[in-house]
């Protein structure tokens, strides 16, 4: 019998067998992916890594899992189409952690997202000392959990112990004033009269111009306010009437602007504040909100002080503090506080307290491992950086202690400082120890070198990729000369490709200066940024890079350029000669299938004009507008120019398939007949052009100057492998970021500041070199480039480095070191310096 058991164990499959994968650019590949191991997938951007990991392994794993559920359940899930692959054997149920977790809503906090708040609410419901209706506190008792009656020992009144649900700010425990969001929108008095040198007749009161009839100035005059003197010369009483005057009916004479006819009316006075409040109450859509928004400001809710909780939910006490205070502690302190909870209670409550606290501690430990110990539970999830949100997702996945699941991690190193990666590795090994498998798509050599097996895709991007070039253990891959990642894993590749600038010359072209007060966990800062140079902002996760650049510098510069008030925490900002500030981040471009590479890069309009001038088009009287696949006559009549149709299958999810009429080209048959003949005698139709990749199209468009230039820019950005008709929503983060840059390159930029938020996301070390050349091109045009980055290769190429830290959260938020690469390396305080 023992032999039989042994035999059974050895027959277990060791690999996921993929045969004939053709998703996106995969070239019909066969590959065996080891199970119960960390399998890295590397390769240049666009070489087919995500196609293999997400398009084949995850798509099939999640689809098969869904197909094993009942039809009824499946109807409620979004359907997964079958991947284009001959067969995939032994794939486990799969979970994917995407590059960019969605931005959470206003009601989501670090506590709700990690579900730590659930355990904490349970503690406060079952273990806390509750308050009787007359304000006396009752000592903690087991009667709460047993749902027995509790009487106050002081006055004998019946005590109601709130359930965990009644302590939730998204449910019954919400503060009635702000509805559990912690902030209220109030009218910003400063914005109502932006220019007090104007008189009311000249339009000094802004909301009356845009949100109200212009008659209000006449009514205001009847209220006893002088409307023909500059606003600043009005008495306090007159200003009070403008801002807060009563809603009285007045009889006014008015003259119609157009006809010059006089008339009389009874009209009720709306003061400036009420005008805004009234408009806010009637807002129905985004556009209406935009008009009102500029007169509002977000304030912390005066009733709950931003804690989001009602008075009753803030009442229970545990170890002397309420739930609101517990949520304000950084995780590190909260963990120590929770550890002391059981001992603060009567003996008979210990077993229950220990089990509740233990469930809290296991989740918290994971988050601490991933370097999130500095976040407090009440931190709004929307204000976290991408990396922080992704690690929240990861911790949630690990907590469930599942087994036999395939985790597909898409670039988990995003937003991780080299010193945080150690914690990530520990989490991956725990997942494997529980009997799971991991697929890891990444470029960070520090993470890839943890993999037990590496599959390298390539050799090029786009059409030239989609093959497996090498696979094996890390030493095996390094030994193979065809491997492109090998030299970077072995650290033999040379990464310094920009000439460094001498320290004396760095600030020669001028500088920007930023001065701020404290906000979040960032202390007050004074920062200089050299103009016309490549400045990199570094530091561990949570050290305040995002806050300094995205919440202080950019809004400050924008406000200064538009002549608006600086954000509250920004004291001053000097930026001589700067006229534009552009943030280039990696958020996806458009969620619409109608947006393509050609439309985004402004090539499509030019192509339509060219085709409208051909003899074929003139004979059939087609104009440029007819060549649009969105609205023109020549779009495909079946799919309306989207290139795909949705099939409605009874009881099953809708399936999107390429349009049978146009084959995905988006154009009707007539469009294929209109061709342009170039000097080499080659004939192309517009649908054919849209199917070319940028590199091929460059050859075909040599005589069209504008199109050629624009495509050349895409090629120089390393996007030569994208087809012109490719949908922009399907691009990876790194591709989206570089496509946004396309319109900026190639013109003088001495008055512009470009800010990049982790541009190396999705970039192979070889692509990083392309990116550095792009930065150099911007700087050669006179631009100032500021980059938030963890990638050591980019940091090594910086002219000037600002290192934040030293830790994350409360331990961070200061500038630890500034200077050139050599100065940072030599600085003992800089954590980043140690890794350089």
Model-derived features: positions:
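Conserved phosphate-binding elements of NTP-dependent enzyme cores
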Residues: 1-836
């Amino acid at each position: 019998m023992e032999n039989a058991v042994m035999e059974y164990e050895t027959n277990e499959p060791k690999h996921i067998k993929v045969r004939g994968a053709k998703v996106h650019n995969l070239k019909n590949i066969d590959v065996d992916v080891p199970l119960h191991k960390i399998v890295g997938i590397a390769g240049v951007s666009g070489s087919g890594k995500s196609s293999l990991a997400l398009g084949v392994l995850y798509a099939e794993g999640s689809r098969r899992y869904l197909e094993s559920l009942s039809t009824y359940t499946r109807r409620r899930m979004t359907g997964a189409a079958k991947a284009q692959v001959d067969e995939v054997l032994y794939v486990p149920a799969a979970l994917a952690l995407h590059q960019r977790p969605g931005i959470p809503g206003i009601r989501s906090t670090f506590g709700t997202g990690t579900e730590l708040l659930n355990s904490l609410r349970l503690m406060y419901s079952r273990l806390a000392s509750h308050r009787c209706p007359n304000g006396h506190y009752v000592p903690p008792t087991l009667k709460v959990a047993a749902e027995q009656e509790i009487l106050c020992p002081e006055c004998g009144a019946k005590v109601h112990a709130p359930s965990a649900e009644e302590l939730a700010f998204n449910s019954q425990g919400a503060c009635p004033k702000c509805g559990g969001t912690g902030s209220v929108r109030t009218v910003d008095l400063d914005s109502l009269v932006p220019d007090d040198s104007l008189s009311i007749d000249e339009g000094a009161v802004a909301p009356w111009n845009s949100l109200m009839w212009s008659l209000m100035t006449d009514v205001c005059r009847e209220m006893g306010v002088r409307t023909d003197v500059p606003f600043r010369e009005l008495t306090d009483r007159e200003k009070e009437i403008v801002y807060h005057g009563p809603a009285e009916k007045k009889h006014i004479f008015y003259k119609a602007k157009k006809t010059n006819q006089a008339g009389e009316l009874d009209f009720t006075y709306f003061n400036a504040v009420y005008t805004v409040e009234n408009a806010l109450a009637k807002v129905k859509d985004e556009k209406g909100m935009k008009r009102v928004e500029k007169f509002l400001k977000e304030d912390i809710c005066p009733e709950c002080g931003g804690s989001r909780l009602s008075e009753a939910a803030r009442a229970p006490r545990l170890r002397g503090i309420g739930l609101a205070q517990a949520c304000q502690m950084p995780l590190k302190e909260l963990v120590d506080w929770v550890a002391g909870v059981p001992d603060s209670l009567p003996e008979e409550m210990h077993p229950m307290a220990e089990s509740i606290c233990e469930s809290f501690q296991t989740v918290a430990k994971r988050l601490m491992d991933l370097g999130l110990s500095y976040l407090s539970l009440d931190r709004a999830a929307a204000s976290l950086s991408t990396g922080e949100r992704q690690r929240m997702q990861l911790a949630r996945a690990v907590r469930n202690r599942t087994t036999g699941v395939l985790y597909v991690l898409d670039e988990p190193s995003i937003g991780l400082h080299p010193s945080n990666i150690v914690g990530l590795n520990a989490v991956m090994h725990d997942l494997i120890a529980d009997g799971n498998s991991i697929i890891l798509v990444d470029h960070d050599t520090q993470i890839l070198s943890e993999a037990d097996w590496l599959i390298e895709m390539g050799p090029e991007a786009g059409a030239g990729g989609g093959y497996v070039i090498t696979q094996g253990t890390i030493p095996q891959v390094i030994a193979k000369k065809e491997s492109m990642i090998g030299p970077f894993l072995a650290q033999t590749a040379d990464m310094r490709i920009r000439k460094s600038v001498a320290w004396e010359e760095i600030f020669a072209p001028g500088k920007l200066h930023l001065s701020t007060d404290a906000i979040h966990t960032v202390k007050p800062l004074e920062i200089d940024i050299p103009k016309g140079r490549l400045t990199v902002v570094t530091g561990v996760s949570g050290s305040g890079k995002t806050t300094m650049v995205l919440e202080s510098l950019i809004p400050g510069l924008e406000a200064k350029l538009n002549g608006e008030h600086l954000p509250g925490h920004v004291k001053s900002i000097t930026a001589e000669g700067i006229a534009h500030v552009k943030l280039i981040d990696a958020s996806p471009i458009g969620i619409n299938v109608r947006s393509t590479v050609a439309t985004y890069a402004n090539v499509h309009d030019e192509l339509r004009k060219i085709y409208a001038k051909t003899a074929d088009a003139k004979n059939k009287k087609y104009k440029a507008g007819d060549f649009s696949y969105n609205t023109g006559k020549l779009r495909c009549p079946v799919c309306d120019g989207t290139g795909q149709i949705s099939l409605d299958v009874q009881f099953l999810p809708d399936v999107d398939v390429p349009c049978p009429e146009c084959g995905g080209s988006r154009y009707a048959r007539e469009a294929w007949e209109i061709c342009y003949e170039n000097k080499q005698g080659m004939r192309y139709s517009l649908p054919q052009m849209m199917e070319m990749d940028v590199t091929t199209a460059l050859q075909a468009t040599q005589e069209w100057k504008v199109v050629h230039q624009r495509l050349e820019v895409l090629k120089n950005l390393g996007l030569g492998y994208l087809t012109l008709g490719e949908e922009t929503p399907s691009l990876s983060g790194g591709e989206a970021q570089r496509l946004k840059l396309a319109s900026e390159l190639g013109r003088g930029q001495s008055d512009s500041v470009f800010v990049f938020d982790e541009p190396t996301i999705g970039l192979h070390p070889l692509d990083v070199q392309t990116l550095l050349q792009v930065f150099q091109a911007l700087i050669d045009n006179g631009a100032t480039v500021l980059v938030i980055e963890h990638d050591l290769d980019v940091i090594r190429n910086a002219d000037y480095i600002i290192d934040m830290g030293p830790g994350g959260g409360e331990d961070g938020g200061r500038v630890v070191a500034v200077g050139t690469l050599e100065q940072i390396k030599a600085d003992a305080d800089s954590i980043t310096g140690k890794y350089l």
